[in-house]
Amino acid sequence: ATLPNLLLTWATTTSPPLITPGEGDLELTPEILAAFTQTLASHQISLTFLSGSWSPALADLIPASAPDMGMLILGAETIYSPAATEAFVEILIVLLRRVKMAKAMVGAKNYYFGVGGSVDGLKIACAAKGAVAYEIENHGVPGLEAGVGRSLVEVQMF
């Protein structure tokens, strides 16, 4: 997830909504940014963003929380090829093992034509590393059935 995507999604949940889903444009004023920051603070949410290739070195950059705390990892469009899937799952497993209660939510196309990544490939790669990955029921969500289809996959250690 990127900060702009989180901001746009948050803006659809305000009362009244600052933007309607699918609209896509939101002028970021100091007031809107302050309201977003206040919402995060009031729910005790902290965000950490990193950029780089999926690798064990990237895992070292991600701050560790206390082992008895929880962790939620969000990922999207990270499994476009079998090599990318393997690299993503490798770092995902490292992060999921850091705490007792951890899960990842991964949004992806069911199949990436021409490059070979797939949701099924993600599930197989996770199982090979001792994790379970399963698709979350999402019938009726606009846009998920169109084209090759999209899935939301939850990953946890077992």
Predicted feature residues:
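S-adenosylmethionine-dependent methyltransferases
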Residues: A1-F158
